[in-house]
Amino acid sequence: MTTQLEQAWELAKQRFAAVGIDVEEALRQLDRLPVSMHCWQGDDVSGFENPEGSLTGGIQATGNYPGKARNASELRADLEQAMRLIPGPKRLNLHAIYLESDTSVARDQIKPEHFKNWVEWAKANQLGLDFNPSCFSHPLSADGFTLSHADDSIRQFWIDHCKASRRVSAYFGEQLGTPSVMNIWIPDGMKDITVDRLAPRQRLLAALDEVISEKLDPAHHIDAVESKLFGIGAESYTVGSNEFYMGYATSRQTALCLDAGHFHPTEVISDKISAAMLYVPQLLLHVSRPVRWDSDHVVLLDDETQAIASEIVRHDLFDRVHIGLDFFDASINRIAAWVIGTRNMKKALLRALLEPTTELRKLEAAGDYTARLALLEEQKSLPWQAVWEMYCQRHDTPVGSEWLESVRAYEKAILSQRG
């Protein structure tokens, strides 16, 4: 430990103790909050089913930075490199298109065996796994509909894909001893004025009920459903809207997924957490950064990321909220994107844990909003960075921007050879 870092740490302990915060306890609590990293940042959501195929479903990964992962071995190596630079507990979030098989596998035929390499890797790296059916980038999703499709056979194909995905998810949880959160997001919607908005939602309701009809052990698998405002090519109507999925999660008691980019630009999911928690058992968060639309930019340590973290900590939602990331930027080094976004999420959680929340609640209850605002602002200047650096040091990860040197070295030695 460097003398400078240790001195800063000792001073930070004193400063936070003066406002009633035990920094050692904050670090212990931070280790209770794993962040689920999304595999698809590493290859621009290409997957291994048809890596040369185009990305569909109203989403885009823009940019052509060299060195993207081309297969599972490269993707796992890249993830390991990123994870070495991120302190504290982590999980990995997989999509169905990241299966591994020597032969072509239809999506409604995926099985746990197609993900056994991921499970063995997760065991070796002490990671939990989360999962997602992939209802996009497929010939049977080309017309913009999947689980709400009017064609019975196509709709059944996607139902069977989601049912098969649930079994894969349960396999993850059973093998790794920690439940896998499986999130269902579909791109279903229409580009222009839609006359019948009801029928697709009726079909989606029935389809989802069939998907979750098989009883699985909640210690192994958790169902989540995710809404969206619009996507490219589905600007006028989205079947799985916020109201639809809020109603579904409430009535079926599934988890509800809130994605930071899936609402109107003036809406924030930090304000939705406390409302949704009154009605659903668990929440899944997709922390992202929408720039004018659901652009999935790399997560910053900005006001909304901080507000999301603060909601989790202030209301002690550690056991009811699952924190995941969802961004994919192909214009910068993809490993750096993972590191920047995940470290920022963890920084936000730490800052929330270092907040004098008890005192702030007292001021709010007393109607002293002047002192509340003053204290909220002044605590931003407390030396949280020194606490973060100690956390990095204890987890044998680089302090400050030192991690960038490792990324550059890996880029030169490994990524540059990929063409």
From Swiss-Prot:
Q: What does this protein do?
A: Catalyzes the interconversion of L-rhamnose and L-rhamnulose.
- Per the UniProt entry, the Enzyme Commission number(s) are 5.3.1.14
One GO term of the cellular component aspect? cytoplasm
Pfam families xrefs:
RhaA
Under catalytic activity, the entry for this protein gives: L-rhamnopyranose = L-rhamnulose
Keywords of the record: Cytoplasm, Isomerase, Manganese, Metal-binding, Rhamnose metabolism
Amino acids binding Mn(2+): 262, 294, 296
Enumerate the subcellular locations listed in this protein's record, separating them with semicolons. Cytoplasm
Any one Gene Ontology MF annotation carried by this entry is:
L-rhamnose isomerase activity
Name recorded for this polypeptide: L-rhamnose isomerase
Subunit structure comment from the entry: Homotetramer.
Free-text remark on how the cofactor is bound: Binds 1 Mn(2+) ion per subunit.
The gene name reads rhaA
Give the similarity note.
Belongs to the rhamnose isomerase family.
